[in-house]
C-alpha cells in the first residue's frame, strides 16, 4: 500500500512539473572566484588557443573538474596555458588565506546571479559580449590591482578580466532538451557528472552544443547539471547560453547560494579568527542552520594544528598559542610509592623499578674469629695520630663518594676509610678519634640512624651542585631549559635576574625609527626590520610600501 501511495505522489509531482507554465525568466545563482595574476599565474598568460582534454571526462569526488595531468610540460597544459597546474584546484574552490606572496593561490568568492530570459522559441538565453560581472569588486576594490585594460579599445577601459564562476543545478529530463554555449575562455559543462562541453584554454569565443536525447538519460529522472567558466586573459569576455532546460536548485547554503560552500559570506580569516595560532579556523559546514540573530563567528570551528614535531612518551609537544611555534617538554615522571624512577622509554613511558636491597650486617652474617685469628695490636703497634692526622671522610663537590664495605676487621692504616652502615642508602660516617686496638668482634648492636646532611637553600640564580651539597651559579643554558624545556628559542636571550629568577627577552630590539619594527627569523635567530604601515606611524614616507633590512646576530650568554 505504501508503495502505491509513493508511486501516486511521484507521478503527481512529475505531472505538475512537466505541465506547469514556464517562467518568463530563469534565475541562476552562481559563485564567482575573483583571481589575481599575482596569486595565480595561470591568469593573464601568453595568448593561447582552444585546448581540449585539459580536464578528465568525469567530475572529481568533490564535484569539481580534475586536470588530466599536473605536469606543466604536457601538450594540453602548455597549449592551454596551465603554467601552474597545482593551482587549478583554486579555479572553482575558495582559498581565503592571509598569504599574499606570488602564486599562493589566494582567491575571493563573490555571490552573483545570472538572469536567463525566455524567448518565443521557449528557450532561455543569456547573451553578453561584455561580461564583466565583478568590476571594482573582490581584489579590485584596491585601486592598485586595477591595472588591466582593454587594449583593443581607444580609451583603454579598465575591467576585471580574471575570474572563474560555477553553478550546480538540477533538471527533470523531459526527453528533448538542448544546451548551446558560445564564449571565452575555459568552459566545461557536465551533465550527470559526465563532460559534454569541452572548450578549455585561453582562446577567442568558441561554440559547442549538446542534444540531451543522445546522452542515454531516462525521461522523468532528475539529473545534476554543472557549469564551469573562466575568464583568464584580456581583452574580451564573451558568454552566450541558450537552453531549453528547466534548471532549478535543490538546496542552498547559509549564504543563499545554490549548492554553495558558505564562502561567499564567511571568511575564515576575518570571521573565524580566534587569535590562537595553534588552531586552524574554518567556516561552518555549508548545511549549518544559522540563527540570524547570531554572528557567523558563533558557528565557526577551530581545529588544532597538526603536530610537526616527532614526540613520544618521554617528550610532549606543546604549541605556543601566541606565536604558533612548537617545542618539546620532557615528560615528568611522578613518584610512586615503593618504586624508584630509573628513566624513560619512548614507547612505554616512565620506567619504575623496586629499590635495590642493601645487604644488612647481622650477628649471624658477621664472621666469628677466635683470638688466635684476631690480630692483636699493642699500643706501640697502633699508629698515633694527631688531630691533624685524624682520618676523615670528607664530602667534596665531586661525584657522590663511593663507600667500601668491609667484612673483616681493618688493619690500622692512615688511609681514611668509610664504614658501611645497614641503611638503604649508603652514607659516610666521619671518624674523629684515633682507633683503639681491635678486640674480638662481638655482635654489633644496630647503629643509630646517621643524620642526612642538610641541603643548602639556593638563591634565584643558583642551582644545587650534582651532589647537592653546595650551590652553583646558573648560566643561560640552565635558564633556557628551565623556561622552555628542550626547545631553544633563537629569538630570545636567556638570563637570570637576582629577584625574578630566570627570564628571557626579545633578541631583536626596537630601534630609534618608530616606522621600522624588529623582526627575528625563528630558524636562524638573525634580526631584520620591516616597515610599519599604520596611521599611528608618523613618518615622511607614511603609507608607502617597502621594507628596511638590518642584520644582527645575538648570542645567548
Swiss-Prot record:
Keywords: Developmental protein, Differentiation, Glycoprotein, Growth factor, Secreted, Signal. Residues 1-19 form the signal peptide. GO terms for molecular function: growth factor activity. Glycans are attached at residues 72, 99, 155, 176, 320, 329. One of its GO terms (biological process) is negative regulation of sorocarp stalk cell differentiation. It holds the Pfam family PA14. N-glycosylated. Its main location: secreted. It is found in: Secreted. GO terms for cellular component: extracellular region. The keyword Signal applies. Residues 355-451 are annotated as: Disordered. The keyword Secreted applies. InterPro entries: Fibro_Slime (IPR011874), PA14/GLEYA (IPR037524), PA14_dom (IPR011658), Prespore-cell_inducing_factor (IPR051154). Disruption phenotype: Cells appear to develop normally; however, conditioned medium from these mutants show reduced prespore-cell-inducing activity. Conditioned medium from mutant show no cell division inducing activity. Residues 116-261 form the PA14 domain. Disulfide bonds: none annotated. Residues 355-404 have a biased composition (Low complexity). Growth factor that can induce isolated amoebae to differentiate into prespore cells. Homodimer. Belongs to the prespore-cell-inducing factor family. This is Protein psiA. It comes from Dictyostelium discoideum (Social amoeba).
